[in-house]
Amino acid sequence: GVQTCALPISDTQAETKSAILCLVDVPSQAYGRREELLGIHQALAGAVDSYARARLAGHPIVSLLVGKSMSGAFLSHGYQANRIIALKDSGVMVHAMGKESAARVTLRSVDELEQLASSIPPMAYDIESYATLGLLSELLSVENPEQPTNDDLLLAKQAIAQAFKEINAEQSRGLEQRLHGQNRQMSKKVRELLREQWS
């Protein structure tokens, strides 16, 4: 499940804000009528709001994707980070829903869905395709994601430390660096057109 923790009240007044590291392995949030009635949507929105407020208040946030990062669970735990780093491994994926669910929703077989994903990167499940959207700051190639070697741990620690260093050196607390991926050009164009029309 998704867990969040409150930062110390004294930290809100501090000039140097506490760093937040999110380790992300969330297969998805719970689905169902009971969960909706009990307010899972409010819990997820509350988590998103907490992370966004922390980031905007100056807390550097780095997410390390070590497993599945699916649906609302990922949106509420990890997606609001200044930097998202992922392990380059077949077990690490980001998507709105699992393949079987996506196949049902799109009225396709899993095989047809995979064939479609091969030509449309945002539909794909592999982390390399997700990286083309410009949302990841780094892909880490490790020897053994399940049982990391000392070199794997060192690589991850160095990447995380570098990400925090870069965030602290920046003036912006936004997420605009995510708009420059090779497969985000149409999204960027839509934003430009909207900006022109609304100016």
Model regions and ranges:
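Glycine/serine-rich loop-strand microenvironments at binding/catalytic pocket rims
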Residues: 1, 15, 22-24, 124-133, ...
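Short, small-residue-biased leader/transition segments that mark boundaries at the very start
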Residues: 3-7
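Structural alpha-beta junctions
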Residues: 8, 57-59, 165-169
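Short N-terminal helix-initiation segments at or just after the protein's N-terminus
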Residues: 8-12, 26
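Short helix-terminating capping/connector loops at secondary-structure junctions
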Residues: 11-17, 56-58
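Short, glycine-/small-residue-enriched flexible loop/hinge segments at domain edges that mediate gating
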Residues: 16-35
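Conserved catalytic cores of soluble enzyme domains
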Residues: 32-151
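Intrinsically disordered, low-complexity segments enriched in small/flexible residues
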Residues: 150-199
